[in-house]
Amino acid sequence: MDINDPSFSSTENGIYELLSRGYAAIEAATERDLKLPELGDIIGQVHAPEYISQVLSGWKPFYLRSVVNIPDRIFEQYNRTECFTQMGLFAEIQRAWITVDNRLFLWDYLSGQNFQAYEDLSHTIVNVKLVRPKANVFVSEIQHLLVIATSQEMLLLGVTIDEKTGELSFFSTGIQISVQGINVNCIVSSEDGRIFFSGNKDPNLYEFSYQLEEGWFSRRCSKINITGSVFDNFIPSFFSFGTHGDGIKQIAVDDSRSLLYVLRETSSVSCYELTKNGVNRCVFYSFSSMISQAQMLNATSPLLDPRTTQIVSIVPIPAYESQQIYCVAITSTGCRFYMRGGRGPISHYAPSNSTLSSTPPSTLQLTFVRFPPPMQVENYASSRNYPANPFFLQNQSTSQQQPERSSAVKTTPMKCSSLSNIYTSDLFFAISSSNTNEGDVVCCTAPEVGRIANAWQSGTQPSLIESSMYVPIKGFVQDIKCIQNSRERNELVSQFNTPPPTFAILTNTGVYVVVHRRPIDVLASAIRMGPSLSSGIDGQVQLFFESVGRAEGCATCLGIVSGCLDQGDFSHAAANFSGSTTKLAQADLLDIVKKYYIEFGGKAFIDQSRYNNQYDSSSLEFVRLSGCHDGLASSISRIIRNVWKNHVIIAKKMQNKRIHYAPAFNATEILKIQSGLLYLSTFLENNKSFIEGLNSPNTLIGSSNVADEIAVQAEHRALSALLLVLQQIVEGISFLLFLNDTGVSDFHEIVSSTSIDIQKSCSNMTFGEFFTSKRGREVTKELVNSLVNRHLQSGGNIDMVSQLLRKKCGSFCSADDVLIFKAVESLKKAKDTVDIEERQSLIELSYTLFKKAAHVFTPEDLRLAVEEYKSLNAYTTAVNLALHVASARDDRNQALSYLVDGMPENDPRREPFESRTKCYSYIFEILDSLESQMSNDSSAIKVDVYDTIQRSKDELFHYCFYDWYSFKGLTDRLIEIDSPYIQSYLERNSTKDMKIADLLWQYYAKREQYYQASIVLYDLATTHLAFSLEQRIEYLTRAKGFGSCHVPNSLRHKMNKVMLSVLEQLDVASIQDDVLIAIRGDMRIPTSKREELSKQLDGEIIPLSDLFNNYADPLGYGEICLSIFQCADYRGINEILNCWESIIKTTHENAIISPVGSSPVEAVSSTLKNLTLRFSQSENVFPIEQIIDITERYAFDQQGEAVATGWVIDTFLGAGVSHELIFIVLNQLYDRREKPWQGKDRLFFLIKEVTHLLKLWHEVSVRAGVAQTSKPSFDAPLVLEAIEKYKNALGAPDTATKSCKENLISLDSEIRQTY
């Protein structure tokens, strides 16, 4: 048994569906961000909307973070009018610079410190540029090159930075070229280190080429004239001094497309392709063509007058920001000319999905003109007096397409300089000179990305919505640089993982640090200023949500929660707001955004456009989720964006052809990501009860609005999935960091110790897959195993590893795998040791460790462990482990309730039930094994195992154990078990198992619980189980017997009620048994039909009505019909009399056709006697008057010599009917003389019957030897009166009546003598 066996798995099967759903939501959010329209789509409309000029300071797109004055020493140098000076910024090394003749001074522009100078030059410095060095030319410490151009030469200085002190060091590279005759005015470089430059009034473009060493046909460094002829490279520059031509004003490089743009004095633009071997011009765009196209697009405007307008700057637009727009030209009037690139005739509004290959463009064409906001001199001039309070700058609303405005505020056209530029995310800085001597004017514009995205997502064609403002500065702008940049074109994404774009504006008075407010900063700023406004915080937040949409508003709130806020803005705002109501602490701000995330996130709803209003299980897929969900998905995707699709581990092939594994992540970066996600996870966990969809999926169950109920369930499912993914990513990052810094073994050793398959998965797996896929968990498990192996080999404490894993990433990677590993190691040692005590100690240790990890055991894990314990004869330990694992796999005890509820189909509790029963099956295998062994040792072990089982408090196990007993044919043993669970087991199974049902009443009877036994027997007799009728009668008979047994007084009343039911059912069952016997012996019925009817009757007890209607009556079983009437207390006299008549008739007919036996009259007499004996006590089925009447009529019809007179009277007297009752009935028949008792013959027949009765009655009443109490009462006066009546009726005797009259006279005399 090996921990590396794949059967030992710590995966939780229930989470993968949620993880997959959460992964899909993050992917969808990422896709939404990627599909945000690019610049080329946004400017597709010719007319852009007006600029938004925010009056409230918190909504302004930029704020002034700080101002750092120029050091006094530098300021003095700059103000020397006799010197040639220039100033600029090196943002890459956080330095400002100034040249004074042949000297170069640098200082840290953020602190005003770290002053340094370079004074080793002989000639006046005319230009300076900081560039990247070419690869593999200089030592690795040199990360930057300083290109210094003087009037005579251009040289390269290596620059290094001390990481601790920040000090700069300069190193001479010995690389320089002559630029005599070229007054260098522009130097640029590409990312790969190529350096290009131009000279003032010089039409040529040059490249400063250098390499590591000189070659056969190339020098180490040289100046290459790119745009001139081949011979120009061999002619000294001073020969061309004074050459007139179309000079170059600016050079710009687009590294993303390998293009170089040249802006000339005539405002024409040339585009060159940068190749490995040189530069090729591919496009020339004249200024006149631009202006013509601009006027076509925007009609006539003074700002487009070619006589007063020129191009002052050309700005490449990187391909990652736009695939369509290649560059933007900025005019002196502040207009921006957006140009598309193409390879042939192009449309002004080409769609963004038009694929652009890597080939250079053959055309550039202006497709959109953006006019500047108006320049308001008065307001701007006044704002210069308050440079330290940027929150209260006053800008006015502007109009885009109407440059000429009539307004109370005086506006003048801009006079933009070449320093005007467009930076990341289309942030535009226009540097314009003013008509005063106070300095330059800085106008900034920024796209309203949130509004643009909201318009696009709502299905509206987006347009370039921008806000604008003027930044108050003092002095004249010397340079402007972006010191915080991002390559992400979507600011909604970049605000989650990069600082806000920050700009340093260098003037002759100081450095102004200006920061762009992203949507996240705007929201925070608006909230902070809310208390001081009449609309309050509610109004400010609502305005923000309306502008960006619910989902983006929620995402922005979560961005603040996750720590993405610009703290500089927060601190600066706190210092500038006045009044107690505006001083919001950071904690207050977080509470506020949490509140609005919940309140303004909206609710999920069913999207009727995709849904047919049929509420079924699939309808959850038609729910449009809330802004809370979409905002959360966007937040997670943006925070994790930089690594989500990246590989976790990289495999490098070394020189020895071996593979070396290393982490593909930066620990600091993923730690920062984890921090943001941890904030989100904590927020969601702490506010679960307030967020609809996370509090409970059953909030609206039972609501009359089914649509709302479905929507809440869908929201809960989606938010729970995201929360799970969030937690898994946080813990997954902890695991990777732990793996990378274990202190035991390096990363490569851990990965390379796994299987080849796992190693391949490691090198191919992305972060997203690693965090959310099942394969990712498998890889994680193997890495943990490898880590444990390495740790054990180094003699480390495995408990420490387990504790650290459980603490850092307990649910992502199971620390319990470590415990399992140690437990398995203990078992291996136990098998190898010969010392009994040590072996037992190791077995107990392994059991303790297995118990701690039981909740991650799979059935296969348990099987392997049980097999190991069996091999060590530790059967009891194996049983205990199986019981513990079963309980751990179902910690909420769902399996038992599933069994008790009847195991409904499609119930989620079925899985834990099957998991537990699988664990129990290993115990039963142990029992089977022990039962098959015959040794004395096995007997002792068997006793211990059964004792362990008996002591178990696992109710479900006991039920399964009893099932196993039944399966083994040991059912009878169950009633011998003394367990608190056996009774409930027997009770539950008695309704579906005949044997168990039969055991249950015995169980009660054995424990003298006769009331319960009677109930069970009654239930058995009336159950649907396949008992025979005989068994049912037996059960009812036994129950009847228990009714006379002793029961507690509290149960006697209940027992009596049960007995009533038992007796009723017993009567019915007896009648049914009579019908069954009758049918089986009824030869009139065909054999097949007889068998069918017998099968129907030999089972469940049938209601009396069914017995009568379906069997007894149709088959002519009169006696049984009378039994049914009696049992049912039926009083329908007609049906009852018909039944009696039918019995007499049937008996007579059967006697006639019978070849042997008595005469018909004798047969009828016998039948009547038996029926009278049986039913005479039931008035409803034995109406004596009518029965005697029917019988006498039959007797009259059957008169003959062979038929004795008075046999009817003899029959009823023999059945116990009194003389007096018979006399009364016959006397009434005579007196009423109803049909058929009319006519002389019939009346004479009745007189003979009465005479016979009276004679017998008198004889009995005077018979000697009979006790007086036993003699029937004899009403002599009534009898004598009747005799007199009958004698008179007979009249004069004739032959027929003579004998009868003589008998009456004789009887009269005897009675008179006796009484």
Curated annotation (Swiss-Prot):
Keywords: Cytoplasm, Nucleus, Transport. One of its GO terms (molecular function) is structural constituent of nuclear pore. GO terms for cellular component: cytoplasm; nuclear envelope; nuclear pore; nuclear pore inner ring. Coiled coil: none annotated. Disulfide bonds: none annotated. One of its GO terms (biological process) is protein import into nucleus. The keyword Aminoacyl-tRNA synthetase does not apply. Pfam families: Nucleoporin_C, Nucleoporin_N. It is found in: Cytoplasm; Nucleus. Gene3D superfamilies: 1.20.58.1780, Nucleoporin, helical C-terminal domain, Nucleoporin, helical domain, central subdomain, Nucleoporin, helical domain, N-terminal subdomain. Belongs to the non-repetitive/WGA-negative nucleoporin family. This is Probable nucleoporin C890.06.
